Amino acid sequence: QAVIDGANEAGGFCFLAHPFERGSRVGPDLDPIEWESWDVEGYAGLEIWNYMSEFKGLLRGKLWALFYAHYPGMGIRGPYHATLEKWDELLAQGKRVAAVGGADAHGKTYSMGPLSRQVFPYTHLFRCVNTHLLTEKPLNGNRGHDKALIYDALREGRTWVGYDGAAPTKGFRFRARSVANEA
């Protein structure tokens, strides 16, 4: 709570990252790092999908690790249901909780015997789970102007999460209508 309060007091904001995570017995650095303090307040949002958290959960053994290190798309399925259920629960309580998704990119190289592989290169990870922002005005290249628009969009929850691993989501549009043509 102190970190969230400090960030807010300094004009920043916080997101709860990888709230639910499965670890892997393949290595100690693959233990789950889940969010536990659900009684905190004042955070801006929740990371509803973390690519590397999902990848880590696929690694049930060394053979699985070798396979998914080369073919991650064969196992990546989407946000954990527990995360989406928690987000729904928080929203049902009347809390404003923005959604973000992330790559959790570290570009670390892992070795297993004579084999080594970077899991995963930044160029791969930044084409996977991405947070898209809906800004009130177009970005114009001015750092101060653009920073304010980006921070406002994040803080206010004008975001959506796309999986660019399947197909590019840039420019994607969606609409919702009710019987009365309201959304």
What do these predicted regions represent?
Residues Q93-A99, A103-A183:
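C-terminal functional module detector
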Residues A2-P121, K137:
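Domain-core and long-helix interface of multi-subunit machines
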